[in-house]
Amino acid sequence: MHKGIMRNEHEHKLQVAICKWLDWTQDFYYYAIPNGGARHRLVAIKLKMEGAKAGVADMFWMVSNKRWKGLFVEVKIEKGTQQPNQKAFEQIALAHGYYYAVVRSIEDCESLIKRFKADEL
C-alpha cells in the first residue's frame, strides 16, 4: 500500500477516535471539514466549486474562551507534518481570532481542551 494512503488511513482512524472521545466527554458542537483525502476527480471538482479549500483544518470545535472565537484542529499521526497550505491556513485562522492546534492523540485533545477552557491559550 502507498505511504500516503497508509498515512491517511491512520489519520482517519485517529480522527474517528477523537470524534468518539468528543461525543463521550465534551458538551460543545464540533464538525469535520472534508477537504482532504483521495476521491474521484469529478467529486473533487464538485467540492471545489462548493467552496472546499486546500489547507483548511480537519475539524472545527465550536467552543470559545476569553481570547479565541473557536478552535480549528488539524489531525496528524506522530510523524505527520503540516503542508505549506495548512501552515498558511493556520496563520489566517489566528489572524481572524480562531485558535489552531495540531493534535496527534486523544491525550493531546484532552490537554488542548483543558487548557483552552481554562483560558491558558
Spans of features found by a protein language model:
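Catalytic phosphate/metal-binding cores of nucleic-acid and nucleotide-processing enzymes, i.e., regions
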Residues: 1-121
